Amino acid sequence: KIYSTKPTLSLAEVILNNTTRILREEFELEFDKSMISNYKEETLDIIPMIMKRCDYNEKVFLSEVFNENISFEFFDAGHILGSASVLINAGGKKIFYTGDINLRNQTLIPKAELPKHKIDILITESTNCAADNYPDYKEETGRLAAFINRVINKGGSVLIPSFALGKSQELLMRVHTLMKKNIIIVLIVTCIITA
């Protein structure tokens, strides 16, 4: 079984099909062509059948998999739609695992939820783990508005490269809000998604 949050399962079909296409193209160009058979679209058809949707904060018991009393629950990681950290209860210990996590509210995604009780082991990605100098949301939005206005007032065009999932939607919402509040002029916004 594959356990996931409901939003992740909803996005999985699109993301997995895209990933499969990219991997097939890369293998055709750079690797042993016999490996391509591992990345067939038909293989993806079984994924929805083996995925189990879980709500955030829903305790899921894995007794059918393990003979021991092992459970887990997802916590919203506040990173992108469907992102989750996981609290695993096993052998009387609490293990909290998280990848990317955001401890501040975004325009579209609320900040991460964390367990309210003591954990025994923390496993985390650490790109910004010890950073305490994150830019202020309002200051960064102000800098974005000033940049856009400066470029547009000089007759230029604004190009903002961004990840297709999560960050693009956040940027579009910020730009929309800035236009709605007349902080920046109304722009023609074009999104180009490339793989």
Tell me the role of every PLM-derived stretch.
Residues 195:
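Ligand-binding beta-strand-loop-alpha-helix segment within the catalytic cores
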